[in-house]
Amino acid sequence: MDKEAKYVYIPDQEGNDVKFEVIIYFEIEKLKGQYIIATPAFEETDEAYAFKIFKDEDGSDIFIALEDDDEEFEMVLETYETLMNEDGLIEE
């Protein structure tokens, strides 16, 4: 994935591509994973979603939404909050 990408298209449950605005991209070495936090580009919402990035056999990015009740999600959330705090973008 282009780490500077502002938008990505992620298929919904019906297979329709939905445009998401990338809030932040980061890697977590401990999990050996790449992640984005993104929000739907054309919706007025305060909700953001965490996605893990995989590659398919053609090398294209596949974005898998993380469930908010697992350990990986918790680590991603902690990393996101730390990065945003370091950048001064959120306050505790």
From Swiss-Prot:
InterPro entries: UPF0473. It holds the Pfam family DUF1292. HAMAP family: UPF0473. Belongs to the UPF0473 family. This is UPF0473 protein Cbei_1107. It comes from Clostridium beijerinckii (strain ATCC 51743 / NCIMB 8052).
